C-alpha cells in the first residue's frame, strides 16, 4: 500500500513549508519560494483543494507596510518575545523552556534511528521548520516509518496549537497565509497517518 509519505508531493510540500518557516525570506533557500507564492501558479501544484487554497493565495499577495524581512525578524528572531515560538519544547515543557525534555526525547529518538540532522545554528532540533525539513529528508530517503514517527510523536502533538497562535499573531499577511497553508496541509497529513498521534499536555 502506498502511503501519502511515498508521494513526491509530500516531500516537496514539507520542504517548501519547512524552508519558509526556518530561513529568512531573503535567503537563497527561500527567496524563490517567496516569489512563487506571490504568483498564482503554485496552487495547481499544491496537493490541496483549490477552493481551500484560494483565500490563502489572495492573502499571500496582500500588501503590508512592514517588509517581509522585518516580519520574519519579529516572528522568529526577536529581540522582543516571539509571539509564537517555533520550538516544540516551549509548548510541551511545563517551564516553556528551550532544550526541554521533549527536545531531549527527540534527540534520543534520532540517535536510536541513526538520524543526523545539521542545524543552521546552535539551536534546538525541535524547530517547526527544521522538523518539516527533516520529514522531507526522511521521505526522500525512503524512511517512511521514521517519518511517520517523527510526525506523530514529535511534531503533531504541538504543531496545531503553535500554528493557531502563529496565525493569530503573525501581524503580516504573508506569514498569516503561510500559517494557514501549513495548518491546512498538516491537517491533511495527520488525517492520513497510520499510527496515532501522541497525546501530550500543552503549557501555552
Curated annotation (Swiss-Prot):
Keywords of this protein's UniProt record, alphabetized? Chaperone
Q: Name one molecular function that GO assigns to this entry.
A: signal sequence binding
> Single Gene Ontology BP term?
chaperone-mediated protein folding
InterPro entries from the entry? Answer: DmsD-type, DmsD_chaperone, DMSO/NO3_reduct_chaperone, TorD-like_sf, TorD/DmsD_chaperones
What's the family? Belongs to the TorD/DmsD family. DmsD subfamily.
Question: What PANTHER family does the record tag this protein with?
Answer: CHAPERONE PROTEIN YCDY, TAT PROOFREADING CHAPERONE DMSD
Biological role stated in the UniProt entry: Required for biogenesis/assembly of DMSO reductase, but not for the interaction of the DmsA signal peptide with the Tat system. May be part of a chaperone cascade complex that facilitates a folding-maturation pathway for the substrate protein.
Name the NCBIfam families on file: PRK11621.1
State the protein's name: Tat proofreading chaperone DmsD
